[in-house]
Design a protein with these regions (language model features):
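ATPase catalytic-site recognition across NTP-hydrolyzing enzymes
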Residues: 2-80
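Conserved inter-motif catalytic segment of the P-loop NTP-binding fold
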Residues: 4, 10, 106-109, 114-116, ...
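C-terminal nuclease/phosphodiesterase catalytic domains that cleave nucleic-acid phosphodiester bonds
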Residues: 34-39, 84-87, 94, 131-138, ...
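Short, conserved, surface-exposed binding loops centered on an aromatic residue
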Residues: 63-69, 83-87, 124-128, 134-136
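Gly/Thr-rich phosphate-binding beta-strand-loop-beta motif of the actin/hexokinase/Hsp70
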Residues: 67-98, 224
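Short His-Asn-centered micro-motif
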Residues: 78, 145-148
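Short, glycine-/Ser/Thr-/acidic-enriched flexible segments
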Residues: 81-83, 98-101, 110-111, 150, ...
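Nucleic-acid-processing active sites and adjacent nucleic-acid-binding tracks
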Residues: 94-145
Length: 247
Protein backbone atom coordinates (compact mmCIF):
# COMPACT_ATOMS: atom_id res chain seq x y z
CA UNK A 1 0.00 0.00 0.00
CA UNK A 2 3.03 2.32 0.50
CA UNK A 3 4.71 1.76 -2.86
CA UNK A 4 3.82 4.10 -5.74
CA UNK A 5 1.84 2.68 -8.68
CA UNK A 6 2.49 4.29 -12.06
CA UNK A 7 4.06 7.24 -10.25
CA UNK A 8 1.02 7.73 -7.98
CA UNK A 9 0.81 7.24 -4.22
CA UNK A 10 -1.58 7.59 -1.31
CA UNK A 11 -1.06 10.27 1.34
CA UNK A 12 -2.70 7.97 3.91
CA UNK A 13 -1.70 4.43 2.89
CA UNK A 14 -2.71 2.97 6.26
CA UNK A 15 -6.24 4.19 5.65
CA UNK A 16 -6.51 3.90 1.87
CA UNK A 17 -3.95 2.13 -0.26
CA UNK A 18 -3.05 3.42 -3.70
CA UNK A 19 -4.63 0.25 -5.13
CA UNK A 20 -7.93 1.09 -3.41
CA UNK A 21 -7.81 4.66 -4.66
CA UNK A 22 -7.10 3.58 -8.23
CA UNK A 23 -9.99 1.11 -8.05
CA UNK A 24 -12.29 3.92 -6.90
CA UNK A 25 -11.06 6.19 -9.69
CA UNK A 26 -11.84 3.46 -12.20
CA UNK A 27 -15.29 2.54 -10.88
CA UNK A 28 -16.54 5.99 -9.87
CA UNK A 29 -14.55 8.68 -11.71
CA UNK A 30 -16.84 11.60 -10.85
CA UNK A 31 -16.89 10.69 -7.16
CA UNK A 32 -13.10 10.33 -7.13
CA UNK A 33 -12.49 13.71 -8.77
CA UNK A 34 -14.90 15.46 -6.40
CA UNK A 35 -13.95 13.88 -3.09
CA UNK A 36 -10.28 13.04 -3.47
CA UNK A 37 -8.82 15.38 -6.06
CA UNK A 38 -10.87 18.44 -5.08
CA UNK A 39 -11.47 18.93 -8.79
CA UNK A 40 -15.08 18.07 -9.48
CA UNK A 41 -16.14 17.83 -13.09
CA UNK A 42 -18.21 20.77 -14.16
CA UNK A 43 -21.74 19.43 -14.15
CA UNK A 44 -22.85 21.66 -16.97
CA UNK A 45 -22.20 20.26 -20.39
CA UNK A 46 -24.81 22.66 -21.70
CA UNK A 47 -27.32 19.99 -22.77
CA UNK A 48 -28.83 18.27 -19.73
CA UNK A 49 -29.22 19.68 -16.23
CA UNK A 50 -28.58 18.10 -12.85
CA UNK A 51 -31.74 19.77 -11.55
CA UNK A 52 -33.90 18.30 -14.30
CA UNK A 53 -34.11 14.91 -12.60
CA UNK A 54 -36.87 14.03 -10.17
CA UNK A 55 -36.66 11.30 -7.54
CA UNK A 56 -39.23 8.74 -6.45
CA UNK A 57 -39.65 6.87 -3.17
CA UNK A 58 -40.52 8.01 0.34
CA UNK A 59 -41.88 11.55 0.03
CA UNK A 60 -41.30 12.12 3.75
CA UNK A 61 -37.67 11.21 3.11
CA UNK A 62 -37.25 13.82 0.39
CA UNK A 63 -38.58 12.15 -2.75
CA UNK A 64 -40.35 14.31 -5.32
CA UNK A 65 -42.83 11.58 -6.27
CA UNK A 66 -44.14 8.40 -4.64
CA UNK A 67 -43.58 4.97 -6.10
CA UNK A 68 -46.44 4.55 -8.59
CA UNK A 69 -49.00 1.98 -7.52
CA UNK A 70 -48.95 0.36 -10.95
CA UNK A 71 -46.69 0.74 -13.99
CA UNK A 72 -48.38 1.24 -17.34
CA UNK A 73 -45.62 -0.90 -18.82
CA UNK A 74 -41.89 -1.48 -18.50
CA UNK A 75 -39.03 -1.69 -21.00
CA UNK A 76 -35.25 -2.09 -21.13
CA UNK A 77 -32.59 -0.02 -22.87
CA UNK A 78 -29.04 -1.31 -23.27
CA UNK A 79 -25.78 0.19 -24.47
CA UNK A 80 -22.93 -2.26 -24.99
CA UNK A 81 -19.21 -1.47 -25.15
CA UNK A 82 -16.98 -3.22 -27.65
CA UNK A 83 -13.93 -3.46 -25.37
CA UNK A 84 -13.27 -3.64 -21.65
CA UNK A 85 -10.29 -1.27 -21.53
CA UNK A 86 -10.54 1.40 -18.86
CA UNK A 87 -10.68 4.14 -21.49
CA UNK A 88 -13.64 2.59 -23.30
CA UNK A 89 -17.29 3.12 -22.51
CA UNK A 90 -19.13 0.87 -20.13
CA UNK A 91 -21.93 -1.58 -20.81
CA UNK A 92 -25.22 -0.46 -19.28
CA UNK A 93 -28.59 -2.21 -18.89
CA UNK A 94 -31.52 -0.15 -17.57
CA UNK A 95 -35.09 -1.18 -16.78
CA UNK A 96 -37.67 1.61 -16.95
CA UNK A 97 -41.24 1.90 -15.72
CA UNK A 98 -43.70 4.24 -17.44
CA UNK A 99 -46.32 6.18 -15.50
CA UNK A 100 -48.29 9.29 -16.49
CA UNK A 101 -45.85 10.53 -19.10
CA UNK A 102 -42.69 9.97 -17.07
CA UNK A 103 -40.04 7.25 -17.16
CA UNK A 104 -38.78 5.83 -13.87
CA UNK A 105 -35.41 4.11 -13.74
CA UNK A 106 -35.76 0.78 -11.97
CA UNK A 107 -33.17 -2.03 -12.14
CA UNK A 108 -29.80 -0.90 -13.37
CA UNK A 109 -26.48 -2.55 -14.17
CA UNK A 110 -23.26 -0.90 -15.33
CA UNK A 111 -19.95 -2.69 -15.81
CA UNK A 112 -17.10 -3.41 -18.16
CA UNK A 113 -17.34 -7.01 -19.32
CA UNK A 114 -16.09 -9.45 -21.91
CA UNK A 115 -18.50 -11.02 -24.41
CA UNK A 116 -19.28 -14.23 -22.46
CA UNK A 117 -20.15 -12.28 -19.31
CA UNK A 118 -22.13 -9.78 -21.39
CA UNK A 119 -24.31 -12.57 -22.79
CA UNK A 120 -24.87 -14.14 -19.38
CA UNK A 121 -25.59 -10.91 -17.53
CA UNK A 122 -27.87 -9.51 -20.22
CA UNK A 123 -29.89 -12.74 -20.44
CA UNK A 124 -30.26 -12.83 -16.65
CA UNK A 125 -31.21 -9.15 -16.51
CA UNK A 126 -33.95 -9.48 -19.14
CA UNK A 127 -35.35 -12.69 -17.67
CA UNK A 128 -35.48 -11.18 -14.18
CA UNK A 129 -37.42 -8.18 -15.51
CA UNK A 130 -39.75 -10.48 -17.46
CA UNK A 131 -40.50 -12.60 -14.41
CA UNK A 132 -41.95 -9.55 -12.67
CA UNK A 133 -44.78 -9.34 -15.24
CA UNK A 134 -48.03 -8.91 -13.32
CA UNK A 135 -50.91 -6.54 -12.87
CA UNK A 136 -49.07 -4.07 -10.64
CA UNK A 137 -45.61 -4.43 -12.16
CA UNK A 138 -46.96 -4.00 -15.68
CA UNK A 139 -45.69 -6.01 -18.61
CA UNK A 140 -42.18 -5.84 -20.00
CA UNK A 141 -43.01 -4.49 -23.44
CA UNK A 142 -39.66 -4.03 -25.18
CA UNK A 143 -35.93 -4.66 -25.01
CA UNK A 144 -33.98 -2.02 -26.94
CA UNK A 145 -30.33 -2.59 -27.80
CA UNK A 146 -28.10 -0.15 -29.66
CA UNK A 147 -27.53 -1.59 -33.13
CA UNK A 148 -23.76 -1.32 -33.46
CA UNK A 149 -21.03 -3.96 -33.65
CA UNK A 150 -21.18 -5.23 -30.06
CA UNK A 151 -24.93 -4.76 -29.79
CA UNK A 152 -25.61 -6.58 -33.06
CA UNK A 153 -23.51 -9.51 -31.89
CA UNK A 154 -25.37 -9.62 -28.59
CA UNK A 155 -28.74 -9.59 -30.36
CA UNK A 156 -27.77 -12.51 -32.58
CA UNK A 157 -26.32 -14.57 -29.75
CA UNK A 158 -29.03 -14.26 -27.07
CA UNK A 159 -32.25 -13.69 -29.01
CA UNK A 160 -33.35 -17.33 -28.74
CA UNK A 161 -32.79 -17.36 -24.97
CA UNK A 162 -35.10 -14.43 -24.24
CA UNK A 163 -38.88 -14.36 -23.71
CA UNK A 164 -39.43 -11.47 -26.15
CA UNK A 165 -37.73 -10.20 -29.27
CA UNK A 166 -35.00 -7.59 -29.02
CA UNK A 167 -35.64 -4.31 -30.84
CA UNK A 168 -32.41 -3.06 -32.47
CA UNK A 169 -31.98 0.72 -32.14
CA UNK A 170 -30.30 2.07 -35.29
CA UNK A 171 -28.02 5.07 -35.00
CA UNK A 172 -29.40 6.97 -37.97
CA UNK A 173 -28.80 10.38 -36.41
CA UNK A 174 -25.75 11.73 -34.64
CA UNK A 175 -25.57 11.68 -30.85
CA UNK A 176 -25.92 15.45 -30.42
CA UNK A 177 -29.13 15.56 -32.46
CA UNK A 178 -30.62 12.76 -30.39
CA UNK A 179 -29.54 14.49 -27.19
CA UNK A 180 -31.13 17.77 -28.23
CA UNK A 181 -34.39 15.95 -29.00
CA UNK A 182 -34.39 14.51 -25.48
CA UNK A 183 -33.14 17.64 -23.73
CA UNK A 184 -36.48 19.35 -23.09
CA UNK A 185 -38.06 16.22 -21.66
CA UNK A 186 -35.24 15.71 -19.15
CA UNK A 187 -35.38 19.38 -18.16
CA UNK A 188 -39.15 19.08 -17.65
CA UNK A 189 -38.75 16.36 -15.01
CA UNK A 190 -39.78 13.45 -17.22
CA UNK A 191 -36.89 11.23 -16.01
CA UNK A 192 -37.30 9.97 -12.44
CA UNK A 193 -34.60 8.20 -10.43
CA UNK A 194 -34.95 6.04 -7.30
CA UNK A 195 -34.21 8.10 -4.20
CA UNK A 196 -31.09 7.02 -2.28
CA UNK A 197 -29.82 4.75 -5.08
CA UNK A 198 -26.01 4.82 -4.74
CA UNK A 199 -25.72 4.72 -8.54
CA UNK A 200 -27.45 8.09 -8.90
CA UNK A 201 -24.36 10.25 -8.37
CA UNK A 202 -22.39 8.77 -11.27
CA UNK A 203 -25.50 8.69 -13.46
CA UNK A 204 -26.44 12.32 -12.87
CA UNK A 205 -22.83 13.52 -13.09
CA UNK A 206 -22.31 11.83 -16.45
CA UNK A 207 -25.57 13.04 -17.97
CA UNK A 208 -25.09 16.61 -16.74
CA UNK A 209 -21.52 16.61 -18.10
CA UNK A 210 -22.59 15.60 -21.63
CA UNK A 211 -21.24 18.17 -24.10
CA UNK A 212 -22.10 19.27 -27.62
CA UNK A 213 -18.48 18.99 -28.77
CA UNK A 214 -18.05 15.38 -27.55
CA UNK A 215 -15.42 16.41 -24.99
CA UNK A 216 -17.15 14.49 -22.18
CA UNK A 217 -15.45 11.36 -20.89
CA UNK A 218 -18.30 8.82 -21.02
CA UNK A 219 -21.85 8.80 -22.38
CA UNK A 220 -23.05 5.20 -22.01
CA UNK A 221 -25.51 6.11 -19.23
CA UNK A 222 -26.63 9.13 -21.22
CA UNK A 223 -27.26 6.89 -24.23
CA UNK A 224 -29.62 4.55 -22.37
CA UNK A 225 -31.53 7.56 -21.01
CA UNK A 226 -31.83 9.16 -24.45
CA UNK A 227 -33.07 5.88 -25.94
CA UNK A 228 -35.61 5.57 -23.12
CA UNK A 229 -36.92 9.11 -23.66
CA UNK A 230 -37.14 8.50 -27.39
CA UNK A 231 -39.03 5.21 -27.03
CA UNK A 232 -41.48 6.09 -24.26
CA UNK A 233 -42.02 9.84 -24.66
CA UNK A 234 -40.97 11.20 -28.06
CA UNK A 235 -42.20 8.42 -30.36
CA UNK A 236 -45.64 8.02 -28.70
CA UNK A 237 -46.19 11.79 -28.92
CA UNK A 238 -45.13 11.81 -32.58
CA UNK A 239 -47.44 8.90 -33.37
CA UNK A 240 -50.33 10.65 -31.61
CA UNK A 241 -49.74 13.82 -33.62
CA UNK A 242 -49.85 11.86 -36.87
CA UNK A 243 -53.25 10.38 -36.01
CA UNK A 244 -54.88 13.73 -35.26
CA UNK A 245 -57.55 14.78 -37.74
CA UNK A 246 -56.95 18.20 -39.24
CA UNK A 247 -59.74 20.19 -40.84
Amino acid sequence: GHDPVDGLWSYWPAKESIADLLALREAHPYTFLSQYMQAPNKLDGGIFTEGGFLYFGDEDGGADLPLPRKWEYRFITADTAQKTNTWNDWTVFAEWGVFEGRIYRLNYQRARMEAPQLRRDFTSFVNACWEKNSGLAGNLRAVLVEDKVSGTGLIQEVQGKLPLRITPVPRERDKLTRALDAQGHQAAGKVVLPLDDPQNFEFVAEVASFTADDSHRFDDQTDVMIDAIDYAIIKPATAADKTKVTW
